[in-house]
Amino acid sequence: MWRRWLCPCCSCCACFPFTADGEDNQKAMKSIRSVYKIGHGPSSSHTVGPYRAAKILGQRYPEADAWQVTLCGSLAFTGEGHGTGKAIRAALPGAEIIFNREEENLPHPNTMIFKALKDGEVIITKRVFSIGGGSIRIEGESPDEEKEIYPQNSFAEILQCCKQEGISLTEFIYRYEGEAVKDYLRMVWSVMQEAIQRGLKAEGILPGGLGVSRKAKLLFEMRCYNENADVTMNRLIAAYAYAVSEENADENLVVTAPTCGSSGVLPAVLYYMQHDRGFPEDEILDALAAGGIIGNLIRTNASISGAECGCQAEIGSACSMTAAALATLYGLNIDQIEYAAEIAMDHNLGLTCDPVNGLVQIPCIERNAVAAMRAISSVNLSRFLYATRKISFDEVVATMYRTGKDMDEKYRETSHGGLAQLYAAKN
C-alpha cells in the first residue's frame, strides 16, 4: 500500500499513498482549476460528482430511454440526506435510484453503477467513482480532469524548484498555469463573495428536517458589549464561514475549496482580509493560487474525500489551504507557508466525518468557522517557529491519508458513528 519516497532536496524519506485502485500515485499534478469547482451544494462528492457523471454518460449514450443508478458505500448511506438522487435526476430525468447498503469491498467508498436501458434492455453498464471535490473517475478510463501540467508532485520538489530559481510560490504556480489562470481565479473569487453576501442576508430554517436555523446574519450583526478587535475579527470570520456553509447546505452555488462541505473556510478568511482589512483583489487571487496548490498536493498524494479519509480530508485540507493562502497574503516566505499548511493539517488529524442525519449541517457548518480561525493561528505560529519544525507538509499529508485508511468506516461519511449515531439514538 505504501512505498518509500526519497526527498529530492535532502536525505529524509516520506511515505506517499497509492490511489484507491492500487495505481501508483506518484505522478504529475493537474491544474489548480481542478481544486476550485463551481457547483451547487450540499456535497461535492455526493451531488457535484454524481451530477457530472450523470451528465457525461447521458450525453455519451443519447439512445438510452431509461437509466438505473445504484449508489453504494457512503453514497448509499448518506445519499438521501445529501440529495444525490436529486442531483442525478437533474442530468438524467426519471432515472431510477437504488441505494445498495449491502455491498462491501468496494474499490472506492463513493461508488455508482450506471445502467443505460433501451426498450427494457441494458445496453451499457458503467461503474463510476466520485473521488472528492466534485471529481469523478469512470472505471477503465482516464480521469476526466484537465491535463497534468506540473512535473512536481510534492511540496519538497516545489520548494527545491523555488529556492534554486529564486522565485516565489505564486510565481512558480503562474509559470505552469499561465497568467490566464488568474481570470479563472477571479471568477472563483466572485462566486465565493456572492455566497457570503447572500448568506449574510438569509434567514430561516435549512432543509432536511433537522430544524437547523441560519446563524450567519446573527453572527454578523450581533456585537458583544465592549467587543475588542480580536473578538470582532473572530466573529466576522465565523459569520462569513457560516454564510457560505449555510448556502451550501441550502443547495445553492458555492466553490469547492477543496469540497462543498468545507467550502466556507478559505473564502471566510480571504473575504475578511479584503473587505475588513483592505487587501487588494490581485493579492487575494495570489492567495487563492497558493491555497490551490496545497489542495492540489493533497488530492494528488492523499484524498480530499470524507468518505475515504474522514473529515480530516475535507476540513483539514481546507484549513491547510487557508493557512497557505493567508501566509502568502502576508508575504511570508515559502518555508513559513509550508509550515503554516503543515500545522493546519497536523491539528485536524483524526477528525471524523459523522454528519447527523446524513446532512451537511451538524457538525459541518460550525467546523468551517472553527477551521477558519485555526488557519489564522497556524499562520501566526509559522511566522516565528518555521526554522525549528521537524515535520514536513508532505509527511503530514501522508499521515492524514494513512490515518484515514485506518479509520473505521462508521467515521467516514456513513452516519453510523460519532455524533450521527448519538443523535439518532436519542431521537
Model-derived regions, located:
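Tryptophan (W) side chains
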Residues: 2-5
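Cysteine-centered motifs
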Residues: 7-15
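Conserved phosphate/anionic-ligand binding catalytic regions in large, soluble enzymes, centered on
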Residues: 36-54, 250-269, 311-319
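Alpha-helical support elements that line or immediately flank enzyme active sites
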Residues: 47-60, 267-278, 323-331
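C-terminal regulatory domains involved in ligand/effector binding and gene-expression control
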Residues: 96-227, 235-236
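Accessory "access/gating" subregions that flank catalytic or transport cores
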Residues: 193-297, 303-310, 418-427
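Contiguous, well-ordered alpha-helical segments that form the cores/surfaces of helical PPI scaffolds
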Residues: 239, 243, 264-274, 289-297, ...
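Functionally critical mobile loop/hinge segments
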Residues: 326-427
